[in-house]
Amino acid sequence: MEITEVRVFPVNEEKLKAYVTITLDHCFVIRDLKVIHGNTGLFIAMPAKRRKDGTFKDIAHPLNSDTREKMERTILAEYDRELKKGGAAPARATGTDPHED
């Protein structure tokens, strides 16, 4: 599996730093990944759905730690590039909604 595209949508929130959309092998898209600033630094949160009991369940996620680490490295590298291009995380502008296509 290869991550063939990473699209980063920075946001101005305390812990949430960006929404991310990735494409795998030019043929499968995963939306709504998040870059989160936690107690130990940045990490990637997988897309999740709130359950009736209020807990969250991942909709899609890697099945092993090697794949998760590869995804995290790739996504965070692109997040860093995006910040360097535009400076600090900008407020979301029209046309930059990760849910548009």
UniProtKB/Swiss-Prot annotation:
- One Pfam family this sequence matches: SpoVG
The yes or no answer to whether the keyword Ubl conjugation is present is no
Mention one GO biological process in which this protein takes part, according to its record: sporulation resulting in formation of a cellular spore
Annotated region (Disordered) at 82-101
The highest taxon in the source lineage is Bacteria
Task: Could you list this entry's UniProt keywords, alphabetically sorted.
Answer: Cell cycle, Cell division, Septation
The record's annotation in PANTHER family points to:
SEPTATION PROTEIN SPOVG-RELATED
What family does this belong to? Belongs to the SpoVG family.
The entry's protein name is Putative septation protein SpoVG
Which organism is the protein's source?
Answer: Anaeromyxobacter sp. (strain K)
